[in-house]
Amino acid sequence: MEDKATTKDLDQWIEQLNECNQLTETQVRTLCDKAKEILSKESNVQEVKCPVTVCGDVHGQFHDLMELFRIGGKSPDTNYLFMGDYVDRGYYSVETVTLLVALKVRYRERITILRGNHESRQITQVYGFYDECLRKYGNANVWKYFTDLFDYLPLTALVDGQIFCLHGGLSPSIDSLDHIRALDRLQEVPHEGPMCDLLWSDPDDRGGWGISPRGAGYTFGQDISETFNNTNGLTLVSRAHQLVMEGYNWCHDRNVVTIFSAPNYCYRCGNQAALMELDDSLKFSFLQFDPAPRRGEPHVTRRTPDYFL
């Protein structure tokens, strides 16, 4: 196997990953190199056309990702936009992120994958992905290939110039999409500043900017969302990052929607998951789904902290 992934290789890898079987370390390296090539050409505000199905956090819940594709349609038949947090917490971060990256490399025009706050070296060392890579490969190389790749993921996407999609939320340092386009994203997620805020902030019932209980990013009120949408000619901010019990939740007088796509989050929260389908004319509908039937989860001791639910 050379360092070139042919279409035939990719199809075979995708087939294997669909069965929840991991790739070899060498195959992952080849895949990540190819993905970097593709992602390096994408913008900080990646343009996406409708129709497209928008998804929130997946967090290594591989069987629920399979359920998501069953409900929403297979890739590439359905166009997808994922808003980050592919790894950590679930038991199958390796298979989940490898599959999404393989689909991106195989069908680059049909799937968009954004960066979430968990697509970071620091966070993955605490919340499970690093340990899982060590357990499944016997060393940290695969973790390194993926976390290096994460620096290339676009920060936000813009669907038909109107619906702005990102993982976390708005930033007091950013008024316009051009400010986002000007950021240097090829780095670890910083502890503060605009790039950090886009991946960490949350909408709030209180107006204005507030200090985030997460220790990174800000909270922002309806006044902020309305101003941002008006300034940038947007109809909606679509984001993920927060567990919502019904899988989706409107706030800020429908200026913001939260979408969460990991059902029964952490295998214990009891929430539904959802997808937002945008049709040819940007009309939205939500599809809710429950966890895939489980055939015995692995008995893994969980040592990850419960903070940041």
Curated annotation (Swiss-Prot):
Cofactor binding note from Swiss-Prot or TrEMBL: Binds 2 manganese ions per subunit.
CDD domains xref list: MPP_PP2A_PP4_PP6
Molecular function GO terms recorded: metal ion binding; phosphatase regulator activity; protein serine/threonine phosphatase activity; RNA polymerase II CTD heptapeptide repeat phosphatase activity
EC number: 3.1.3.16
Binding residue positions for Mn(2+) 2: 85, 117, 167, 241
Required cofactor(s): Mn(2+)
Subunit composition and interactions: PP2A exists in several trimeric forms, all of which consist of a core composed of a catalytic subunit associated with a 65 kDa regulatory subunit (PR65) (subunit A). The core complex associates with a third, variable subunit (subunit B), which confers distinct properties to the holoenzyme. Component of the Integrator-PP2A (INTAC) complex, composed of the Integrator core complex and protein phosphatase 2A subunits mts/PP2A and Pp2A-29B.
Role played: Catalytic subunit of protein phosphatase 2A (PP2A), a serine/threonine phosphatase involved in the regulation of a wide variety of enzymes, signal transduction pathways, and cellular events. PP2A is the major phosphatase for microtubule-associated proteins (MAPs). Key mediator of a quality checkpoint during transcription elongation as part of the Integrator-PP2A (INTAC) complex.
Protein name stated in the entry: Serine/threonine-protein phosphatase PP2A
Source organism (scientific name): Drosophila melanogaster
The organism's taxonomic lineage, starting at the top: Eukaryota, Metazoa, Ecdysozoa, Arthropoda, Hexapoda
